Amino acid sequence: MAIYFILYTLLTIIFAVSLSLFLSVINARKSRKRAVGFFHPYTNDGGGGERVLWCAVKAIQEENPDLDCVIFTGDHDSSSDSLARRAVDRFGVHLQSPPKVIHLNKRKWIEESTYPHFTMIGQSLGSVYLAWEALRMFTPLYFLDTSGYAFTYPLARIFGCKVVCYTHYPTISLDMISRVRQRNSMYNNDASIAKSNWLSTCKLVYYRAFSWMYGMVGSCTHLAMVNSSWTKSHIEVLWRIPERITRVYPPCDTSGLQAFPLERSSDPPKIISVAQFRPEKAHMLQLEAFSLALEKLDADVPRPKLQFVGSCRNNSDEERLQKLKDRAVELKVDGDVQFYKNAMYRELVELLGNAVAGLHGMIDEHFGISVVEYMAAGAIPIAHNSAGPKMDIVLEEDGQKTGFLAETVEEYAEAILEIVKMNETERLKMAESARKRAARFSEQRFCEDFKTAIRPIFTGPLK
């Protein structure tokens, strides 16, 4: 008798919870607001993704002024006015009006530190919980994900939203699966796993299962904008909705940077590296390459300075930055290396305008906004020979070379030496071609392509 009572109680609870959830969704669908909800939990990361957010807000305000723009963020110190100011101060983007802000309390569910193991699936499922919180508080007509949380798309559709995403890179890529299969150690494939046949097999099964789920949820979007040829090729295979996928190059500050003269001071020549202090950005490789270049430098060639410019998101990034500083001391190049943490936009622009070269070290960087910024400013890029930089950016312009591609410490060092040793005429010619190439990725071009992509969705009927 007792077991029946327990079973009845459990079924009653399940029914009550299900009914409550169902009614919440129904009420939310009925109360949808004429607004675009930007799902961007981190509005202070300072990277290219945040620039896309503010340029997208600006584009929608220009294209659809009758729609409110609402930011779903986990940054509780952010307000409408402070975010509008940040868009100007950090990225030079002027919004027509400050966006509305919805503060989220469950952001810990998408933080990497919450999931020491099975991080991808943990963060992905956590994003669903966070999106549930967001959509219950405010349900917009249009749900626009600018942070790559594809697992939120089915939920947003259940809430009656048109789903649009701007995908910087796939959460899982065919390259990641290939590396696990080949047992290559990397920042996202621990050496202990790569060395073990059993663990590699288990991880391969996990990755394949996740890629199937990722494909299912990704296919729920009404429109997917991707930022590069590399990302487009992967998303088309994973999501299998090629007719709903379009490439929109990300916004780069080319207009302001192109105002700088191409001439540079060679006392000393400055080499810049702009990237968040994240493990995949390969700052250590750049430092090692710079040190090697100095060792090989002829006595009659000006000794360059290396400037690291980036933001720190958390304690892990802070520790990574400190290790970089310590390594500079070990290599005895600390006097030749400068660090700029969380630099404001104006300072970043000034540094770019004085650099002769720019370093980029990330393997399979989906696009590479920093590379475009180097080129626009007149700094010759030295980028990793993969993905976005290789396929879209560091290509010849009118038959003229626009920069260098490298993979190893030695290749980066050789490229640094070649630029430092260049005569002024040769350097100016390459810098001019690089700047011309960068014009293809302007903020204005992004806004035009973004508006063209969303127009059929925003003018079509809501289902």
UniProtKB/Swiss-Prot annotation:
Residues 118-138, 367-387 dip into the membrane without crossing it. Its main location: endoplasmic reticulum. It catalyses: an alpha-D-Man-(1->3)-[alpha-D-Man-(1->6)]-beta-D-Man-(1->4)-beta-D-GlcNAc-(1->4)-alpha-D-GlcNAc-diphospho-di-trans,poly-cis-dolichol + 2 GDP-alpha-D-mannose = an alpha-D-Man-(1->2)-alpha-D-Man-(1->2)-alpha-D-Man-(1->3)-[alpha-D-Man-(1->6)]-beta-D-Man-(1->4)-beta-D-GlcNAc-(1->4)-alpha-D-GlcNAc-diphospho-di-trans,poly-cis-dolichol + 2 GDP + 2 H(+). It holds the Pfam family ALG11_N. Keywords: Endoplasmic reticulum, Glycosyltransferase, Membrane, Transferase, Transmembrane, Transmembrane helix. GO terms for biological process: dolichol-linked oligosaccharide biosynthetic process; plant-type cell wall biogenesis; protein N-linked glycosylation; response to abscisic acid; response to osmotic stress. Expressed in shoots, leaves, sepals, filaments, siliques, stems, roots and guard cells. Its EC number is 2.4.1.131. Residues 30-117, 139-366, 388-463 are cytoplasmic. One of its GO terms (molecular function) is GDP-Man:Man3GlcNAc2-PP-Dol alpha-1,2-mannosyltransferase activity. It is a single-pass membrane protein. Pathway: Protein modification; protein glycosylation. Disruption phenotype: Lethality. InterPro entries: ALG11, ALG11_N, Glyco_trans_1. The chain crosses the membrane at residues 7-29. GO terms for cellular component: endoplasmic reticulum; endoplasmic reticulum membrane. GDP-Man:Man(3)GlcNAc(2)-PP-Dol alpha-1,2-mannosyltransferase that operates in the biosynthetic pathway of dolichol-linked oligosaccharides, the glycan precursors employed in protein asparagine (N)-glycosylation. The assembly of dolichol-linked oligosaccharides begins on the cytosolic side of the endoplasmic reticulum membrane and finishes in its lumen. The sequential addition of sugars to dolichol pyrophosphate produces dolichol-linked oligosaccharides containing fourteen sugars, including two GlcNAcs, nine mannoses and three glucoses. In the absence of ALG11 activity, no N-glycans are produced and transferred to proteins. Belongs to the glycosyltransferase 4 family. This is GDP-Man:Man(3)GlcNAc(2)-PP-Dol alpha-1,2-mannosyltransferase.
